[in-house]
Amino acid sequence: MPVAFDEVIEKIAVAARQVEADGGASPILVAIVREFQTKLAKTEKLGTDGVPDRDSVIELEQAGDSAKAAADADTRLAPEVRESVLAAHLAICKLKAGA
């Protein structure tokens, strides 16, 4: 079943809320997840009828790659918070792939 852009939006929002609330999250991860949100806002703005354009999706995926790497490297991050970042990354990858 294909991933809808709405699901990507929700997964990124959940990950951002959890990272912001996790006192163990590194400042680097917090900054990277904020950039992920910024790229999401740009993608939403450039979309047509709720469908993001391809270039924006690629940019968003790159931000997701950075967020995933930062979450994996953050040893003090709560496991459920790490999982939410990984879920956001996976959602954007699936959207890009059309899966």
PLM regions with names:
Residues 17-62:
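Amphipathic alpha-helical interaction modules
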Residues 11, 39-45, 68, 94-96:
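Context-gated lysine
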Residues 10-16, 59-70:
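Extracellular/lumenal glycan-associated surfaces
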